[in-house]
Design a protein with these regions (language model features):
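A generic structural signal for ordered secondary structure
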Residues: 69, 112-113
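Class I S-adenosyl-L-methionine
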Residues: 34-103
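Short beta-strand segments
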Residues: 7-8, 82-84, 114
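Mixed-charge interfacial surface used for oligomerization/domain docking
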Residues: 2-3, 11-19, 23-28, 33, ...
Length: 256
């Protein structure tokens, strides 16, 4: 009997699955004084509060090849899922680990999916892989089915703060501060190339959530599964769920 495993970097918002062996390779956030490892033991609230107060710089670090090999374990067939290669080196590290694993373990196979996305969309992709495994599909058929599924999924997002982006040098600290003072939210989507593309700058959380719901329709969503991810904002996630349920029929929504 083949031993099957799903492995993902920790951007996926999951740490366990119901029916399939699953493991994450942790992302990290590093400052001059501290290192945060994104695993099941991470105090997310404590980390977020620390980074919000941080005056210095921070940087993120993707799993390295050794991290991926450790996560692979000794499975016969591995389905590996990474955050978009447009934002991180996670995919390249996973591909390097795949080459080493398959070279050292004859007959064992790894497929690496570059999601070209982040967060909740990765969750949907992982759940699709598990669904295919439950149907006892072959390795090749699972790869084909999930690749086709990824062409039908998408990501839209809302950011209330640009503080972390300022800390790691992606945006000007002045811009981040002005956005916060003005109460502006950034609403955008994951592009086909795997970058995060800002589209709207509504003022106020409620208007931003309404804009986000409108983006779903603009991106062609009509019915099906939606995964909502959030950081320290469960109330906004619940409001978004209500807005979506009011606008669309035949929708199944999970909040992570």
């Amino acid at each position: 009997m083949r031993k099957i495993k799903i492995v993902a970097d920790s951007s996926c918002d999951l740490f366990e699955l119901t029916h399939t062996e699953f493991e994450t390779a942790p992302m990290k956030i590093i400052t001059a004084e501290r290192e945060f490892v994104d695993d099941a033991n991470l105090d997310v609230d404590g980390m977020a509060d620390y980074l919000y107060q941080l005056k210095g710089k921070s940087k993120s670090s993707c799993p390295n090849t050794t991290d991926w090999l450790d996560a692979f374990g000794d499975a016969d067939e591995i389905f590996c899922v990474t955050i978009t290669s447009g934002l991180s080196g996670s995919y390249n590290s996973a591909c390097a680990a795949k080459q080493i694993y398959e070279a050292e373990k004859e007959g064992k196979r790894v497929h690496v999916f570059d999601t070209l996305s982040a967060g909740p969309e990765i969750t949907l992709i992982i759940e699709k892989i598990e669904e295919c495994i439950d149907k006892d599909m072959s390795f090749e058929d699972i790869c084909d089915c999930v690749t086709a599924y990824m062409k039908k999924t998408g990501l839209v997002f809302m950011l209330k703060s640009l503080k972390t982006f300022a800390n790691n040098g992606r945006v000007s600290p002045i811009v981040a501060k002005l956005v916060g003072i003005a109460g502006i939210c950034i609403v955008g989507k994951a592009s086909d190339e795997g970058t995060l593309e800002p589209m709207h700058k509504p003022r106020g959380e409620r208007r931003a959530l309404e804009t986000l719901t409108g983006c779903l329709e603009a991106e062609g969503f009509k019915f099906g599964r939606i995964s909502i991810g959030h950081c320290q904002n469960e109330s906004a996630a619940e409001q978004l769920k209500e807005l979506i349920l009011a606008k669309f029929k035949n929708v199944s929504i999970e909040i992570h």
